[in-house]
Each structure stands twice: as structure tokens, then as C-alpha cells.
């Protein structure tokens, strides 16, 4: 058996050290572990008939709580001073040890004490904690009790209690408390507390809402300094307890303050917060006492984090859906429990989202519309002034708050919480039609396996007399004015079976419907386990497309006519810089390409470790996205140059808009290559991977925002993360159905223009204003320095504060001045007026969120005047530690919860010693640690 350890020594030693209790009182010999069986109630000590061993009813693990009694004294009739035998599967500790270590918050926070399975016996005044992972389900709180007379008044007992090793001498008369009755638990009669406390659980999806009555009793032993002394055995109903609990008195009072004279007033206030917030239980009573019960992390990973904390100590049950355990909006202050397994997963997620289908068809088309190479000039300017700083801002906000876009913006600036909701709405609208492109890719992918691809010639049943096969080089023949290529007719007549316009919706395309269902099935099964499942899929879907892009680019630059296409791509026309549309297109492509202001980057960063290097990730994602856009541009314009040579026309005349760029132009070019089937299969598989990467991110930001914003509704109606993902996928699929009818391509083009392009710059402007101006560039810089150890550069801060907002506002105003209604097929089809009304309705879905949520938060805010309400809605909801001023620190969660509970106690229960509670409200937790004599003398505040 190991030697005895001092409490303070144990709290500062390694977890492998063991606390061994002193020998039990005379006549009580402790049992060995081998003597403690798993059946019924039996004697805990040799010769002690009244000691009980109670086994819980847990179905997952056996929970043992030892109820000792004084030899020869029936339960409830005498003070208990005997030791508490310790079982490894129990959570046992001492109030005295916690009282002794109250002034050492850091050891309590960062040190774990555990015992090995042996015959140790717990004496009052010593610490025992344990390591096992066991489920606890029986509602039991048992303490030693004093005599009670018929009126319920406590009779002081004269039993002597041996002093613990490290505590001062214990007063000979134990503190007293009224006693009531005996209850039955697990078939054994147990003397329990006179105090009934109602335990309200607001846990999460793993723990159903419950109201369990727990009988508790304060030990009633104090030393000469007023510190609480006594053994405690505890189990809590409904809590999954993978780690032990320790009990920490928040205010140490003398024994006299334990007396109660009114039985009706003997109620204990209890508040259980989420398991994610240290599974803490704040308990206070009518005389100002309060206890906080917390879990002590003891797993290998948690111990390593406590010794070498790279991130804040893990807070709660490690589970895939732990963020569903939030009970209210205050739970959003806690960091997200789930994290990326490694940094590569996060980087691949960001790259996979930013490098999507927009790089393949939108970038070449925008470059073509903006005069070729001159487009790269405003594109790079906006990239370095707006896009990169905004990406860094989004990653910082997501990583710091640990929330999705709605929760993050709501914490930093509640008035602009609607900007986060608007981003989620835009992402949801995109998910409804973005999946259609994935469906097209699936259709083309399987069609490419045919021996002869159907878009090569005009000998198919869907071809029309206008079908014209481009002539080989050397033949001077131009296409007729009404001609259509085989790939164009295959896409419109076979795949889409396109109608005459939006006013002619037509029938459902069942082949596309099947492809759409396949696309959503892949999205669902890749995201149903949140980032743990999608991150594994991205190892392939986010890397393999780059291999294919390089292969296709190398093949394209070797085609005849590629030089002419590259000349169009890289040769700028400087006069086009005066055209406002060039800047508008460059800004739109920047935001669509990098994926900023859609909420996905904030959502991804919320799963980061707290000290992740954000700047490095920002540079990596931006650089890869820029390089990929250039590679795709080289591939696209080399292909267009070859097509222009084949058709004996200009590069400007062969490019298509919208999805036609990738499903008309590219297939036609690859049909002329050797091994056409191979190149087609590779190309459409690349499109499939790129589309899935983007769709994963879009679905994840919607799911994350729903779970962060409506945890109670989700817990009540859906329950599991898989059900939430299924719900989002089904709803998005249903809203995407109009895109796969015969007139769906017109609807697709309308949605793409109004849902994303029109609103995206306004959302980016509002986001920069909310974070950089109202939350403050200084605050954000401080947050970044707290996370990474280095503050943002002057360049980033100036872009956040001045350059970025000004440039965004100017481009947004220019876009309104130079606004043009969308068309289809390069102006061949013009939408009816009512279609534009539908488009603006889609745009308003996101835009109205910003003023709407601002009004709601204003009406909900406190304040007597208009400006007081405005100030309150602009005030961040992020808690800053009163000790160090930081959000994530070793003082944060205990400080916050204890201080808030002290304030709640002041409003609900009138304390016996108001001066003590007032000191607690002024000074925070430290004043609450002191005894009344200490507090009245000035306490930690020196007042």
C-alpha cells in the first residue's frame, strides 16, 4: 500500500500518484475489493451490521455507493464518523479537500487525482478520485446525518471524528441539520437527507429531459477555520459520467450557519448545465451556501491536454453530436466539442469547397465576358484587398467562437446576426440547384462509357436538320447562322429535352431525377456523421481532381489552335478596365470561387483546434484556389482555341454561358481527341468530385446552423445528427425538383443569378461592417493573437477597416447602376417580366434576414431608451474572463458559471449573510471562497 499523501501535494502531482486514507476507526476493518461482490446489500466492514453496499440499476455499468453507519446505531439515529470504503466504479471525494484547495484554482483545473483498485478507505478530509469510464444512472446523494427529534430539529451528536492528515483539528461537535425521513433505493433502506432538491436537467440529445428528486445532505462538519469537512458519495440521475465528479464548495461557512428552523425553507436550488460545460451542477440553499459539482477529466488525451494545453481543456462528453446538447443560447459560449482529426482535413475541406465547379465553367466564362486577360487585373486586386482579408476574418471568427455563421455573428454583433442567417439562406438556395449539376455530371459520366459517344455526330434520333458537324482543319467552311453542334443538341434535346421557355415547364425528366437522387444519396452518406465522415471522403474527392486538371491541361495545350485561345486568355485589353462590369464580374467570381460570405468557411473553422494557425491556412487556400483557376483557364481557352480552329470561327463565338460551358463546349472538344472515351470519363469524374466537395460544404453549413440555432427543437423532433442531415437533404432535393423538368434550365439560370450573384457582395459588405466596425478590429486582432500568439498585420487590419468595405461598397453600387436582367444562351432567350419578380423574391429571402433580425434583436434588448437598446444589440455576447480578460482560459468556465449562479442565488433566495453574497457579486468567485469572517474582514478584495 502506498504512503499517505498530502492533499495539496496530490493536487499538484501526476495522475499516477495515489491517495491512501488513514486507517478506519477502531473496530472497523476495511474489506478488500475481492470481498465486494456485485449482488444486493452486504456488510462493508467486518462486524458492522448497519453498513450498506448499494448497487445501482445501471444497465451499462455497476455503480456502487457505500453508505456506512456507526456500529450499533440504526440509520438516522446517530452521527456517522466512520470511513467510506472506496470502490473503483464510484465517484467519491471530500468536501474538506476541496475546501483546502479553494485558493488553488489552477491545480483543480489542470490536475487529476486517481486511485488504483485496492482496499483504500476514504476518511473525511481526504481526496479520492477515479479514472474509470462508467455510466451512472441512479439518483442518489448520501451523506452522514445527525440525530433528529420528533419536530425535525437536529440534535448535536457528540461523536468524535478523527482529524484528517492535512486538515486542522475538527471541532468536537459536528454541524447539525434537520432530518426528515427514510427512503428506499434499489431495494435497500437508506437514511437520507432532510433536504429535497429538484434536479432539473437541461442536457442534450443523449439525456432526455428529466425532473428527478434527489435526496441530499450536507455533511455538517467544519474545522476551526470554517472549512467544510466530511465524506461524500454521489451519483447523478441520467448523466453519462465517463469521468469522476468532484464537489467544490463555493462558500465556506461555519457550522452554525447550517441550522434550519423552518422545514419549508429547506430547499436546495439546483441548475445543471450542459455536459459540454464541464457537466457542472450549481447547488445553493436558502442560507447562501452553494456547491458546484464538476467532472474531472482523467482520460489519457484529457490529461495530456491539461499538462500541455494547446487548446482549452475538453469540456464534456466526446461525442459526434455533443453540440446538440445545448440547452439555450448561453451554451453557444462553449467551444464546439468535435474537431478535425488533423490539420489536413480542414485544409482539404476548405480547398475542396473553394475549388469547385465555379472554377471550371464560371471563371472562363467571366474571363470571356470581361475581355480576356484584362479580367485578371481586377480579379487579383479584389483578391488581395477583399477576398483574402475576408477569408482570414471568417476563419478567425469561426475558430474563436466555435459556432456556425449564425451563432458566430450573433455573439460578435447581435444586431447583425441576420447577416449570418442570410449566408445560410444563400447556401440553402444554392444547394437546391447545385446538386443538379452533379446530376448532369453523373448522367454524362455513365454515358461516356459507350463505345461511341452520342455527342460526336448528327446521326441520332434527337438531332435536327440544324445539326452541323464542325469541319476538320484545312477545310474553309464556316458554320451556318442557325447551326447547332452535336454536343449542343445532345445536351438540350436529349438530356434536358428543353422546352420553349420558363412559361412552358413541361414534364419531369425521370433520367435526371434518378441522377439527382444518386447525387443526394452520395451527399447524405458522406455528411451523415458530420465532419468525421465527410473529411475521410475528401481525402480522395479533394485531391484526385487536381491530378485530372493537370492531365487535361497538358493535353489541351498540345491541341491545334490552343495558342490562339491562350493568346485571348492572357492578352489584356486595358481599355476594358473602365468598364464597371469587369470589376463586378471579378468581385462576383472572387466570392464564388473562394466560397466566402456563404458561411461554409466559418462553419469549417468552428471545428478547428483553438490555437490553429489561421493565417497559414488562409494563404494556402487562396494560393491553391488562384493556381487552380489559372490552370483551368489554360485548359478552357486551349480547348476553345481548338474549337475555334475546327469551326473556322473566332474564340468569342464558341464559348457558352452557364452549365453549357462544361456540358456543350468541353464534350465537343474531347470528342475530337484520341481515346475520347478515356478523356470524357476522366473529365466528368472530375466534375463529379468537384461538385460533391462543394455540396458537402453547403449541406454542412446548413446542418451546423440549424443545430446551433435550434438545439431544443432539434432534440425534441429530430434527435440525432443523421436525422438532421437527412431532413436537410430531403428538403433541398424537393426544392431542386423544378430544375429537372423540361423547362428547368431556365429556372436554374434564374436561381443562379438572383440567389447568389446579386446578393453576395451586399452580404460581404454587411459582414465586414459587423465584425470590423461594430465588434471592432482591435478586438478581433486581440482574439487572433490569443489563439495564434501573433496579431494580424497592419495590412489585414487596414483592409478590414477601410479598404475592403470601401471597395465592396463601390462595386455593389456599380452593380446596381449597371444592372442587366439575366438571359439564357447568350441572349437568345429573354425571360418574361414575372420571372424577374420571382428572381427578386429569391434574392429577398436572404436580404430581408439582415434588417428583420436587427429589428427582432432590438425589440428583445433591454434598455429604457432607443440608444440604450441600440448599444445593447451592438454589445458582443462573448464572455471575457474577469481575471485575464480572455475568452478561453483556465479561469473562464468556473469563473463564469460560479459568478452567474451567485447572481441567480441573490435573486431567488435570500442568504443568511447578505454581505458575503454582495462581496461575491463584486469580486466574483474569490470572495465566495472565503468564510464569513474572512469576507467581513475584507476578503480577497481587500475591502
Curated annotation (Swiss-Prot):
Glycans are attached at residue 476. InterPro entries: Na/ntran_symport, Na/ntran_symport_inebriated, SNS_sf. SUPFAM superfamilies: SNF-like (SSF161070). It is found in: Membrane. Expressed both maternally and zygotically. Developing embryos exhibit expression in the posterior hindgut, foregut, midgut, Malpighian tubules, anal plate, Garland cells, and a subset of cells in the central nervous system. Central nervous system expression is seen in segmentally repeating in cells flanking the midline of the ventral ganglion. Isoform A and isoform B are colocalized in both the nervous system and the fluid reabsorption system. Residues 1-345, 857-943 are cytoplasmic. It is a multi-pass membrane protein. GO terms for biological process: glial cell growth; glycine import across plasma membrane; multicellular organismal-level water homeostasis; neurotransmitter transport; perineurial glial growth; regulation of response to osmotic stress; response to water deprivation; sodium ion transmembrane transport. Keywords: Developmental protein, Differentiation, Glycoprotein, Membrane, Neurogenesis, Neurotransmitter transport, Symport, Transmembrane, Transmembrane helix, Transport. It comes from the Eukaryota. Belongs to the sodium:neurotransmitter symporter (SNF) (TC 2.A.22) family. This is Sodium- and chloride-dependent GABA transporter ine. The lineage of its organism: Eukaryota, Metazoa, Ecdysozoa, Arthropoda, Hexapoda.
Amino acid at each position: 500500500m502506498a504512503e499517505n499523501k498530502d492533499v495539496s501535494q496530490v493536487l499538484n502531482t501526476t495522475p499516477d500518484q495515489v491517495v491512501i486514507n488513514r486507517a478506519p476507526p477502531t473496530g472497523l476493518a476495511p474489506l478488500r475489493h475481492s470481498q465486494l461482490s456485485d449482488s444486493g446489500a452486504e456488510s462493508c466492514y467486518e462486524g458492522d451490521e448497519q453498513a450498506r453496499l448499494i448497487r445501482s440499476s445501471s444497465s451499462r455499468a455497476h455503480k456502487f455507493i457505500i453508505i456506512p453507519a456507526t456500529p450499533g446505531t440504526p440509520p438516522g439515529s446517530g452521527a456517522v464518523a466512520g470511513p467510506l470504503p472506496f470502490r473503483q466504479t464510484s465517484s467519491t471525494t471530500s468536501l474538506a479537500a476541496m475546501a483546502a484547495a479553494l485558493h488553488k484554482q489552477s491545480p483543480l483545473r489542470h490536475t487529476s487525482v486517481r486511485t488504483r483498485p485496492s482496499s483504500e478507505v476514504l476518511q473525511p478530509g481526504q481526496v479520492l478520485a477515479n479514472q474509470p469510464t462508467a455510466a451512472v444512472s441512479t439518483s442518489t446523494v448520501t451523506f452522514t446525518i445527525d440525530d433528529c427529534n420528533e419536530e425535525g430539529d437536529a440534535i448535536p451528536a457528540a461523536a468524535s471524528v478523527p482529524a484528517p492528515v492535512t486538515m486542522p483539528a475538527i471541532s468536537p461537535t459536528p454541524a447539525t441539520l434537520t432530518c426528515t425521513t427514510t427512503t428506499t433505493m434499489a431495494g435497500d433502506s437508506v437514511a437520507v437527507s432532510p433536504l429535497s432538491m429538484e434536479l432539473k436537467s437541461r442536457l442534450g440529445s443523449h439525456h432526455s429531459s428529466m425532473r428527478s428528486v434527489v435526496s441530499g445532505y450536507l455533511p455538517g462538519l467544519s474545522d476551526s477555520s470554517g472549512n467544510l469537512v466530511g465524506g461524500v458519495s454521489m451519483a447523478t440521475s441520467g448523466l453519462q459520467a465517463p469521468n469522476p465528479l468532484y464537489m467544490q464548495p463555493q462558500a465556506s461557512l461555519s457550522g452554525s450557519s447550517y441550522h434550519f428552523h423552518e422545514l419549508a425553507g429547506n430547499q436546495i436550488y439546483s441548475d445543471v448545465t450542459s455536459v459540454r460545460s464541464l457537466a457542472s451542477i450549481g447547488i445553493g440553499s436558502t442560507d447562501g451556501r452553494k456547491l458546484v459539482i464538476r467532472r474531472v477529466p482523467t482520460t489519457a488525451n484529457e490529461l495530456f491536454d491539461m499538462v500541455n494545453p494547446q487548446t482549452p481543456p475538453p469540456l464534456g462528453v466526446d461525442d459526434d453530436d455533443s453540440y446538440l446538447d445545448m440547452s439555450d443560447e448561453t451554451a453557444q459560449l462553449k467551444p464546439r466539442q468535435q474537431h478535425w482529426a488533423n490539420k489536413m482535413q480542414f485544409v482539404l475541406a476548405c480547398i475542396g469547397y473553394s475549388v469547385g465547379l465555379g472554377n471550371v465553367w464560371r471563371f472562363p466564362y467571366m474571363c470571356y465576358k470581361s475581355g480576356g486577360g484584362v479580367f485578371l487585373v481586377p480579379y487579383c486586386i479584389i483578391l488581395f484587398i477583399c477576398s483574402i482579408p475576408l477569408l482570414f476574418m471568417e476563419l478567425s471568427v469561426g475558430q474563436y467562437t466555435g459556432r456556425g455563421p449564425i451563432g458566430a455573428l450573433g455573439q460578435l454583433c447581435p444586431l447583425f446576426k441576420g447577416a449570418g442567417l442570410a449566408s445560410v439562406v444563400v447556401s440553402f438556395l444554392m444547394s437546391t440547384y447545385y446538386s443538379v449539376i452533379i446530376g448532369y455530371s453523373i448522367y454524362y459520366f455513365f454515358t461516356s462509357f459507350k463505345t461511341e459517344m452520342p455527342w460526336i455526330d448528327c446521326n441520332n434520333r434527337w438531332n435536327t436538320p440544324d445539326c452541323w458537324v464542325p469541319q476538320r482543319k484545312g477545310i474553309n467552311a464556316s458554320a451556318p447562322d442557325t447551326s447547332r453542334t452535336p454536343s449542343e443538341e445532345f445536351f438540350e434535346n436529349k438530356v434536358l429535352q428543353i422546352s420553349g421557355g420558363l412559361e412552358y415547364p413541361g414534364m419531369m425528366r425521370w433520367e435526371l431525377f434518378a441522377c439527382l437522387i444518386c447525387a443526394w444519396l452520395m451527399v447524405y452518406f458522406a455528411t451523415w456523421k458530420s465532419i468525421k465522415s465527410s473529411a475521410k471522403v475528401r481525402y480522395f474527392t479533394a485531391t484526385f481532381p487536381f491530378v485530372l486538371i493537370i492531365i487535361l491541361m497538358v493535353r489541351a495545350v498540345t491541341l491545334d489552335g490552343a495558342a490562339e485561345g491562350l493568346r485571348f486568355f492572357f492578352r489584356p485589353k486595358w481599355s476594358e478596365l473602365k468598364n464597371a462590369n469587369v470589376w463586378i464580374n471579378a468581385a462576383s467570381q472572387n466570392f464564388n470561387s473562394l466560397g466566402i460570405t456563404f458561411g461554409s468557411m466559418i462553419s469549417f473553422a468552428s471545428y478547428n483546434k483553438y490555437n490553429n494557425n489561421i493565417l497559414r491556412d488562409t494563404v494556402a487556400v487562396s494560393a491553391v484556389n488562384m493556381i487552380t483557376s489559372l490552370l483551368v483557364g489554360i485548359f478552357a481557352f486551349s480547348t476553345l482555341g481548338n474549337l475555334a480552329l475546327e469551326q473556322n470561327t473566332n474564340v468569342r463565338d464558341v464559348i457558352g454561358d452557364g452549365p453549357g460551358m462544361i456540358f456543350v463546349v468541353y464534350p465537343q472538344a474531347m470528342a475530337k481527341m484520341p481515346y475520347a472515351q478515356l478523356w470524357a470519363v476522366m473529365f466528368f469524374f472530375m466534375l463529379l468530385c468537384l461538385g460533391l466537395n462543394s455540396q458537402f460544404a453547403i449541406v454542412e453549413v446548413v446542418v451546423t446552423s440549424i443545430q446551433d440555432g435550434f438545439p431544443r427543437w432539434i432534440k425534441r423532433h429530430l434527435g440525432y445528427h443523421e436525422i438532421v442531415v437527412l431532413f436537410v437533404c430531403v428538403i433541398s432535393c424537393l426544392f431542386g425538383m423544378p430544375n429537372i423538368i423540361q423547362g428547368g434550365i431556365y429556372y436554374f439560370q434564374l436561381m443562379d443569378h438572383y440567389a447568389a450573384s446579386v446578393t453576395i457582395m451586399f452580404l460581404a459588405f454587411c459582414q465586414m461592417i459587423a465584425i470590423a466596425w461594430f465588434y471592432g478590429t482591435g478586438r478581433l486582432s486581440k482574439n487572433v493573437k490569443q489563439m495564434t500568439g501573433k496579431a494580424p498585420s497592419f495590412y489585414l487590419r487596414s483592409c478590414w477597416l477601410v479598404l475592403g468595405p470601401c471597395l465592396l461598397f463601390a462595386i455593389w453600387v456599380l452593380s446596381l447602376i449597371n444592372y442587366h436582367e439575366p438571359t439564357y444562351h447568350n441572349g437568345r432567350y429573354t425571360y418574361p417580366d414575372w420571372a424577374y419578380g420571382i428572381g427578386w423574391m429569391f434574392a429577398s429571402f436572404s436580404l430581408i434576414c439582415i434588417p428583420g433580425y436587427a429589428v427582432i434583436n432590438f425589440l428583445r434588448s433591454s434598455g429604457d431608451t432607443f440608444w440604450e437598446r441600440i448599444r445593447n444589440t451592438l454589445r458582443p455576447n462573448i464572455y471575457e474572463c474577469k481575471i485575464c480578460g480572455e475568452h478561453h482560459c483556465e479561469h473562464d468556465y468556473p469563473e463564469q458559471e460560479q459568478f452567474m449562479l451567485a447572481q441567480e442565488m441573490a435573486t431567488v433566495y435570500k442568504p443568511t449573510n447578505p454581505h458575503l453574497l454582495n462581496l461575491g457579486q463584486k469580486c466574483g468567485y474569490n470572495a465566495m471562497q472565503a468564510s464569513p469572517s474572512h469576507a467581513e474582514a475584507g476578503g480577497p478584495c481587500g475591502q
